[in-house]
A protein has these predicted regions:
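Small-residue-enriched transmembrane helix starts and helix-helix packing motifs
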Residues: 14-35, 142-156
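Membrane-interface helix termini and inter-helical loops of multi-pass transporters
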Residues: 15, 103-113, 203-215
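Small-residue-rich hydrophobic segments that form or flank transmembrane alpha-helices
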Residues: 24-89, 151, 166-221
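Hydrophobic/small/kink-forming positions within alpha-helical transmembrane segments
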Residues: 69, 73, 92-100, 130, ...
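Transmembrane helix exit motif
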Residues: 74-82, 117-143, 232-233, 255-260
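Hydrophobic alpha-helical transmembrane segments in multi-pass integral membrane proteins
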Residues: 156-164, 198, 254-260
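Interfacial loop-to-transmembrane junctions
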Residues: 231-250
C-alpha cells in the first residue's frame, strides 16, 4: 500500500513536469530498451537520438542509463546460464579504462570526432569479418590479446559518452561467431557490469542522474518488463542464420550513423 502511494505521488509529479511528447518518448524508449536487452538490439537505433531531442543530449544519457540497468538485470535473469564469462572478463579492464578516457577528453575534444574515428574502425572490422565469412577464412586477429582490448576500450568510451556501445559489442561478438543465445547472454552480462559501474560516474561526475530522473525510471519499470518479454518471444522465433543477418544489417546501419 505504501509503495502504491509513493508511486502515485511520483506519477503526479512527473505528469506536472513532462509534456505529452516527452511522455510518449519515454514510454516508447522504455519498451524498446526492454526489447533490445533481451535480443532485438537494433531497435535502440532510433531511441538514443529521439530521447536526445526530447530531453536534451546530456540529460537523456542520465534518463536512459538506469532503464538500461533495469533491462540488463532482466536479461541476465533470463540468460544467466548461457554467457561465456571468459569473453566478458577479457573486455572489462579496457572498458573501464575507456570510462576514464571519456571523462578526461569530455571537455577537450568534440564527441563527434571520436565517434567518427570509432565508426571507421568498426567499419574496417566489419569488412574483415564479412570477408572472412564469405571466403571461409578464419579471422586470426580475434585470438590476439589486443583484439579484445581494443574493443573493450572502444566499448567503454562510447557507452560513457552516449550509451552507444551496442555496435562495438556487435562487431566483436559477430567476429567471434557466437551463437544466438550465447551472443545475447554475453551482451547481457557485459552491459550489466558496465552500466552499473557507470552509474556513480554519471551521477557524481557529470551530474546526469537526478532524483527526479530516477523517479521517472521507476515509473517505467513495468513498461521495460513488457518490452523484455516481447524481446524474448521474438528471439525465440528467429532462426540462427536470420538472427545473425539481422544483427549484421543493424550493426552496419549503426556504424554508418556513427560516421555521418
Amino acid at each position: 500500500m505504501i509503495i502504491k502511494i509513493i508511486l502515485c505521488t511520483f506519477a503526479l509529479r512527473m505528469i506536472e513536469t513532462l509534456t505529452y511528447m516527452q511522455w510518449a518518448v519515454i514510454v516508447l524508449s522504455a519498451l524498446c530498451v526492454g526489447m533490445s536487452k533481451t535480443g532485438v538490439q537494433g531497435i535502440m537505433l532510433m531511441i538514443v537520438p529521439i530521447l536526445a531531442m526530447a530531453f536534451g543530449a546530456k540529460e537523456s544519457t542520465g534518463i536512459i542509463l538506469p532503464m538500461l540497468c533495469m533491462a540488463d538485470i532482466m536479461a541476465v535473469a533470463y540468460y544467466k546460464r548461457i554467457a561465456d564469462w571468459k569473453i566478458v572478463v577479457k573486455l572489462l579492464p579496457t572498458a573501464i579504462l575507456g570510462f576514464f578516457l571519456a571523462i578526461g577528453v569530455d571537455s577537450l575534444v568534440p564527441h563527434g570526432q571520436f565517434r567518427q574515428l570509432m565508426g571507421w574502425t568498426l567499419m574496417l572490422a566489419l569488412v574483415v569479418m564479412i570477408w572472412s565469412e564469405i571466403f571461409g577464412k578464419e579471422n586470426r586477429w580475434m585470438k590476439k590479446w589486443w583484439y579484445a582490448a581494443i574493443f573493450g576500450l572502444m566499448g567503454g568510451f562510447t557507452t560513457m559518452i552516449g550509451n552507444a556501445a551496442g555496435p562495438v559489442m556487435s562487431v566483436y561478438l559477430l567476429s567471434m561467431r557466437k551463437e544466438k543465445m550465447e551472443y545475447i547472454g554475453i551482451n547481457a552480462w557485459f552491459f550489466l557490469v558496465v552500466n552499473l559501474l557507470k552509474i556513480p560516474l554519471q551521477a557524481f561526475v557529470w551530474n546526469n542522474i537526478t532524483w527526479n530522473s530516477l523517479q521517472l525510471n521507476l515509473l517505467m519499470l513495468p513498461v521495460i518488463g513488457v518490452g523484455a518479454v516481447i524481446g524474448v518471444s521474438i528471439v525465440k522465433q528467429l532462426p540462427e542464420k536470420v538472427f545473425r543477418r539481422f544483427i549484421q544489417v543493424v550493426t552496419i546501419l549503426s556504424v554508418i550513423l556513427m560516421i555521418i
